[in-house]
């Protein structure tokens, strides 16, 4: 059982179907059922409906137990809105939401509401691949800005997570406003893709090693080492 009684902390946007949320008590419990899907929490939808004007959704994803909740809270000066765990098992299940009370301005000066989404960490020992895929898919599709949080030097496993995002983008059919399949040109589809999918940030944490001497900066390292087979377009 986990308690969320404080009004100044996040609530679940969606939970696994083996968890039940009680808005009156601010708690969720695990029912003992097998986890097979996610469901939307009605209280979170009600809170979202109160938001007026432009919205920027900032989501964070990555391996479990690597400090995602802490980073997301601190980056937007919203301390302790996402609960922090101190055990092997993950603290966050499903996707949790916090609406930043203060309005912010984007790069164009437009005022907007920032919604923070903290997602369940991938690769938990008690989790399954289907769970990770469901969480990762929703995190990508809901985000305006997606932060991928990893610790240490990038690994092949990190790339597998990014490869999932690329495959997801290839599977989604771009549709016109009326719901019919778009007959637009490849260039128009690419432009629409960049408007639809989130701005991506790979957050490298706790990296004490220096980049190779033949690389001018971290971007060149990614292009020549990490994404050498995918090319510059994929790295961007």
Where in the sequence are the language-model features?
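Conserved GTPase G-domain substructure that encodes guanine base recognition and part of the catalytic core
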Residues: 1-236
């Amino acid at each position: 059982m986990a308690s969320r009684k404080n009004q100044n902390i996040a609530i679940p946007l969606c939970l696994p179907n083996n968890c039940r949320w009680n808005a009156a008590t601010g708690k969720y419990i695990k029912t003992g059922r097998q986890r097979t899907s996610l469901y939307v929490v009605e209280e979170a939808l009600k809170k979202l409906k109160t938001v007026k004007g432009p919205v920027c959704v900032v989501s964070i994803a990555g391996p479990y137990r690597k400090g995602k909740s802490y980073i997301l809270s601190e980056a937007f000066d919203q301390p302790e809105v996402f609960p922090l765990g101190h055990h092997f098992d993950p603290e966050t299940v499903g996707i949790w939401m916090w609406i930043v009370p203060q309005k912010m301005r984007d790069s164009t000066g437009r005022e907007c509401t920032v919604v923070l989404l903290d997602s369940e960490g991938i690769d938990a020992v008690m989790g399954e691949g289907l769970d990770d895929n469901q969480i990762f898919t929703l995190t990508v599709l809901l985000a305006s800005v997606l932060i991928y949080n990893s610790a240490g030097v990038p690994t092949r496993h990190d790339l597998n997570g990014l490869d999932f995002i690329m495959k997801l983008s290839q599977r989604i059919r771009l549709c016109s406003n009326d719901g019919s399949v778009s007959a637009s040109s490849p260039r128009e589809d690419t432009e629409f893709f960049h408007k639809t999918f989130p701005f991506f940030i790979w957050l490298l944490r706790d990296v004490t090693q220096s980049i190779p001497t033949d690389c001018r900066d971290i971007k060149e390292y990614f292009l020549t080492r990490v994404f050498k087979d995918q090319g510059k377009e994929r790295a961007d």
